[in-house]
A protein has these predicted regions:
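Catalytic cores and adjacent flexible loops of soluble metabolic enzymes
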Residues: 1-194
């Protein structure tokens, strides 16, 4: 309800956090406008809701577009809406299983999406662990989205696919290490090897 959103907004502003939420219909999008969020988010289930996509793109805010449960034709249409209006966006590779098994994550799709759409690509993970998110960064993901919870045993549709505090800390730590681990790709003899 409204009181929960006001609590989230107040807390995040106090901590300097840019929060935002997925609007699942135009009325929800109008509701979220009162919080002057910097970003918009299209949930995977809304990827084919053309009036909603057009309204979101019309706001001109950078939008994160999740692509779970979709075919290329759906992504093509969404991308064209945002490109025609010149609204900045990031495609979020996602598998809409809660939780996703590691073998369902298909992280190799990230560079494919990047090449096909010539845009920023991120990863919205719903797996139990942290490795797929780290591998997503190694494959070129520029944004990582994970659900978080205080307790994975709590009741809720996505609690088991969420990270607790320690899991979030590990994800951030390991994702930040990817660049130095990947290196430059140049074949050089390091000082330690000499």
């Amino acid at each position: 309800g409204l009181d929960k959103y006001q609590e989230i907004d107040k807390y995040c502003k106090g901590k300097g956090i840019e929060w935002f939420a997925s609007a699942w219909d135009i009325e929800s999008l109008k509701f979220l406008r009162q919080y002057t969020c910097k970003y918009n988010k299209v949930a995977s289930a809304m990827l084919t809701h053309i009036p909603l996509l057009e309204t979101i793109a019309g706001e001109g805010k950078h939008t994160f577009i999740s692509t779970g449960m979709s075919e290329y034709k759906h992504i093509d249409e969404a991308v064209s809406i945002f490109q025609e209006i010149d609204c900045p966006f990031t495609l979020m590779h996602s598998v809409s299983c809660y939780p996703s098994l590691d073998e369902e994550c298909n992280i190799s799709l990230i560079p494919v999406l990047k090449e096909k759409y010539q845009c920023r690509v991120g990863y919205s993970g719903h797996e139990k662990g942290v490795l797929p998110s780290v591998l997503a960064v190694a494959m070129g993901a520029q944004v990582i989205e994970r659900h978080i919870t205080l307790d994975r045993t709590m009741y809720g549709s996505d609690q088991s696919a969420s990270l607790e505090k320690r899991g979030l800390e590990l994800t951030v730590r390991d994702c930040r290490s990817v660049g130095s681990i990947m290196g430059s790709g140049a074949k050089v003899i390091s000082e330690k090897e000499k």
